[in-house]
C-alpha cells in the first residue's frame, strides 16, 4: 500500500503468473465484526456484489458498516492468476485488482444503495491508482452477478459521470464486467477485516466529494 513510480500496465494472459490449483492459506471462518461466515454458501434471500475501489482494507470497512450487509471479505479479482498471493497481486503480474465481496440482504439495502456508496467512497477517474496507491491492483471495478446488477451499474456510472463532469472531474475509468469468468480469490487471513484488527491502520481511499444521484446516503459515521 505505497506509492510506486513505475507506469502500471496490465499483463496479458500469457504474461501473467500461473498461480496454483489450490490456495496456500486458509480463510477465517467468521467475520470479526458481523460474526457471519465469510465464505458461502450463504442463506437464501441474500445477494452477492463485488466491488474494487482501491486498497481493500478501507474499502471493506465501508461496506461492513452498512446496514443490511451480512458479511464481507476481501480478495483478488479480474485477472488471470489462480489462487494468487498478496505479493503476487502487488507485482502487477496477475491482472487482479483488490476487491471486496459484499453479501447483502436486498430487503434492507438495495444494490443501488451499495453502488452509491461505491462511487462516493473513492475517485473512479484515476485509472491504475487510488490516491497515493499506484498499480493495476488498485483500479476501480464492478463485477456483476446478474443482468439486473449490470444494468444498475451501467446506469449509475452514467449518472455519476454527469455530476462529475459538471464538477470538473475527468472521465470514469471503472471497469464494469460480469463476475462470471472472473473468479473472486479470497485474500490471506490477515487482510480480512484488517481495520477491525488494526483500528489505526492505513486507509488510502477517499472520495471526490461529489454526491452520486442514486440510492440513499448511509448514515453519518459509516
UniProtKB/Swiss-Prot annotation:
Query: For this UniProt entry, which segments traverse the membrane?
Result: none
Q: Which InterPro entries match?
A: Met_Sox_Rdtase_MsrA_dom, Met_Sox_Rdtase_MsrA_sf, MsrA_MetSO_reductase
State which Enzyme Commission number(s) the record gives.
Answer: 1.8.4.11
Top-level taxon of origin: Bacteria
Residue positions of the active site? 55
Enzyme superclass (EC)? oxidoreductase
Enumerate the UniProt keywords alphabetically: Oxidoreductase
| Gene3D superfamilies for this protein | Peptide methionine sulphoxide reductase MsrA
The reactions it catalyses are: L-methionyl-[protein] + [thioredoxin]-disulfide + H2O = L-methionyl-(S)-S-oxide-[protein] + [thioredoxin]-dithiol; [thioredoxin]-disulfide + L-methionine + H2O = L-methionine (S)-S-oxide + [thioredoxin]-dithiol
Sum up the protein's function in the record's words.
Has an important function as a repair enzyme for proteins that have been inactivated by oxidation. Catalyzes the reversible oxidation-reduction of methionine sulfoxide in proteins to methionine.
The text of the family note is:
Belongs to the MsrA Met sulfoxide reductase family.
From the Swiss-Prot or TrEMBL record, give the protein name: Peptide methionine sulfoxide reductase MsrA
Amino acid at each position: 500500500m505505497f506509492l510506486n513510480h513505475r507506469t502500471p500496465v496490465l499483463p496479458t494472459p500469457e504474461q501473467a503468473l500461473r498461480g496454483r490449483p489450490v490456495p496456500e492459506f486458509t480463510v477465517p471462518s467468521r467475520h470479526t465484526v458481523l460474526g457471519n461466515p465469510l465464505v458461502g454458501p450463504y442463506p437464501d434471500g441474500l445477494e452477492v456484489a463485488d466491488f474494487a475501489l482501491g486498497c481493500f482494507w478501507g474499502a471493506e470497512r465501508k461496506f461492513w458498516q452498512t446496514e443490511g450487509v451480512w458479511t464481507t471479505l476481501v480478495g483478488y479479482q479480474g485477472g488471470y492468476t489462480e489462487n494468487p498471493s498478496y505479493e503476487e497481486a502487488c507485482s502487477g503480474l496477475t491482472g487482479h485488482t483488490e476487491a471486496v465481496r459484499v453479501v447483502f440482504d436486498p430487503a434492507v439495502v438495495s444494490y443501488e444503495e451499495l453502488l452509491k456508496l461505491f462511487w462516493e467512497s473513492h475517485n473512479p477517474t484515476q485509472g491504475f491508482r487510488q490516491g497515493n496507491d499506484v498499480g493495476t491492483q488498485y483500479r476501480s471495478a464492478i463485477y456483476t452477478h446478474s443482468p439486473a446488477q449490470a444494468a444498475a451499474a451501467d446506469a449509475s456510472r452514467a449518472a455519476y459521470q454527469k455530476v462529475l463532469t459538471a464538477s470538473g472531474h475527468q472521465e470514469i475509468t471503472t471497469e464494469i464486467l460480469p463476475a462470471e469468468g472472473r473468479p473472486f480469490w479470497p485474500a490471506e487471513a490477515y487482510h480480512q477485516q484488517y481495520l477491525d484488527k488494526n483500528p489505526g491502520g492505513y486507509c488510502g481511499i477517499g472520495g471526490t466529494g461529489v454526491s452520486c444521484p442514486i440510492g440513499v446516503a448511509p448514515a453519518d459515521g459509516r
